[in-house]
């Protein structure tokens, strides 16, 4: 039995290495230490101790191959900048050969007949300045256009000149802004084709509005309007019309009828009397008596006394104690609740 146990330990390293080769993970250098084990057997009177220390290193074959492959690919990218060449070379390394050449799929150029030359137009205008400079710039770089650009430019339309506008005798002169604009353009050598005054219609000859009728019953201006007019006059601003013309007269309404004094009206309550006294201390006198607006007290008949019921039950305990408490303070109830 001891021999079987002793032969087990040399196979530990081989078993771990075999498991690692079948797996895809990497293992860093490890140290395995087996503690001493005392074994006793009835067949052997003495005990024996076994200890083992094994060092092993498992290289990461997958990472090493990946590092070599990435290094080769990076050098390949640097050597072949063309994407197409790198793709063909990559396929060739894996034993893949394209069935056809890529040039076979490019159709030939169509054999179209040359277009007929355009007819030169005698009325065609010359090339503009921008086109001439473009043609000159292309010629400096050795580029010759296949056709003349002037062939594609239609001739200028032969429209009749517009009729001259009729000068309006009533037309007003140009405003100050337009005159300054014309002067500014003339300083830069720009002359307008027409006068701007031709397009400005004359001022309408509207009749002056009739003056407003002065109202004899109109009241004078209020204090705010008078101060506003005085403020404008201090700054040299005179209104075109009098503001009093637009203020309607005060309505002539009849005075309200005085209220009828009610003989049965009750006097003012305490709160109203104190309010009137407070206003009088500050010199404020109400225009009317507040008692005029207080209606008289209603003259309702006195309620009928309740009928005493002989069969009425006695007062409850709470009511009896309340009546006793009032009697102790000198309060005597005239009727029984």
UniProtKB/Swiss-Prot annotation:
Q: Could you tell me the superkingdom of the organism this chain comes from? A: Bacteria
Q: Where are the sequence repeats?
A: 96-142, 143-189, 190-236, 237-283, 284-330
Region of interest: 5 X 48 AA approximate tandem repeats: 96-330
Question: Quick one: where is this thing mainly located?
Answer: secreted
* Keywords on record: Host cytoplasm, Repeat, Secreted, Virulence
Enumerate the InterPro entries for this protein: T3SS_EspF, TccP2/EspF(U)-like_sf
Question: Could you list the residue ranges forming a coiled coil in this record?
Answer: none
Q: Where is the composition biased (Pro residues)?
A: 295-306
| Listed GO CC annotations | extracellular region; host cell cytoplasm
* UniProt subcellular location: Secreted; Host cytoplasm
Subunit comment: Interacts with host BAIAP2 and host WASL/N-WASP. Can also interact with host proteins BAIAP2L1 and WAS/WASP. Identified in a complex with host proteins BAIAP2L1 and WASL.
In the record's own words, the domains note is: The N-terminal 21 amino acids are necessary and sufficient for translocation into the host cell. The C-terminal region, composed of several highly conserved proline-rich repeats, interacts with the SH3 domain of BAIAP2 and BAIAP2L1, and the GTPase binding domain (GBD) of WASL/N-WASP and WAS/WASP. The N-terminal translocation signal and two proline-rich repeats are sufficient for triggering actin polymerization, but each additional repeat gives higher activity.
Query: What does the similarity note say?
Result: Belongs to the EspF(U)/TccP family.
What does the record give as the function of this protein? Required for efficient pedestal formation in host epithelial cells during infection. Acts as an intermediate between Tir (via host BAIAP2) and host WASL/N-WASP. Directly binds and activates WASL/N-WASP, which stimulates actin polymerization and leads to the formation of actin pedestals at the sites of bacterial adhesion.
Identify this protein by name. Answer: Secreted effector protein EspF(U)
**Can you name the source organism?**
Escherichia coli O157:H7
Chain's gene name: espF(U)
């Amino acid at each position: 039995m001891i021999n079987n146990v002793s032969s087990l330990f040399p196979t530990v390293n081989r078993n771990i290495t075999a498991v690692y080769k079948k797996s895809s993970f990497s293992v860093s250098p490890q140290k395995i230490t087996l503690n001493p084990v005392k074994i006793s057997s009835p067949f052997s009177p003495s005990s024996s101790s076994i200890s083992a220390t094994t060092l092993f290193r498992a290289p990461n074959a997958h990472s090493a191959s990946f590092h070599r492959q990435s290094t080769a690919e990076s050098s390949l990218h640097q050597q072949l900048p063309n994407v197409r060449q790198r793709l063909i070379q990559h396929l060739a390394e894996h034993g893949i050969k394209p069935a056809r050449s890529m040039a076979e799929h490019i159709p030939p150029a169509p054999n179209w007949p040359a277009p007929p030359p355009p007819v030169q137009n005698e009325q065609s205008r010359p090339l503009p300045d921008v086109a001439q400079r473009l043609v000159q710039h292309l010629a400096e770089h050795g580029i010759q256009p296949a056709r003349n650009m002037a062939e594609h430019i239609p001739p200028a339309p032969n429209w009749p000149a517009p009729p001259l506008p009729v000068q309006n005798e009533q037309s007003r002169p140009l405003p100050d802004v337009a005159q300054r604009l014309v002067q500014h353009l003339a300083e830069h050598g720009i002359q307008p084709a027409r006068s701007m005054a031709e397009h400005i219609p004359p001022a309408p000859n509207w009749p002056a509005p009739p003056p407003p009728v002065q109202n004899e019953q109109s009241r004078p201006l209020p204090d705010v309007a008078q101060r506003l007019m005085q403020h404008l006059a201090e700054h040299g601003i005179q209104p075109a019309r009098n503001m009093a013309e637009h203020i309607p007269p005060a309505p002539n309404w009849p005075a309200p009828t005085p209220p009828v004094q009610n003989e049965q009206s009750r006097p003012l309550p305490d709160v109203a009397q104190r309010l009137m006294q407070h206003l009088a201390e500050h010199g404020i006198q109400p225009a009317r008596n507040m008692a005029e607006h207080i209606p008289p007290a209603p003259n309702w008949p006195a309620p009928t006394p309740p009928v005493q019921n002989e069969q009425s039950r006695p007062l409850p305990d709470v009511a009896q104690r309340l009546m006793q408490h009032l009697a102790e303070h000198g309060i005597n109830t005239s009727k029984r609740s």
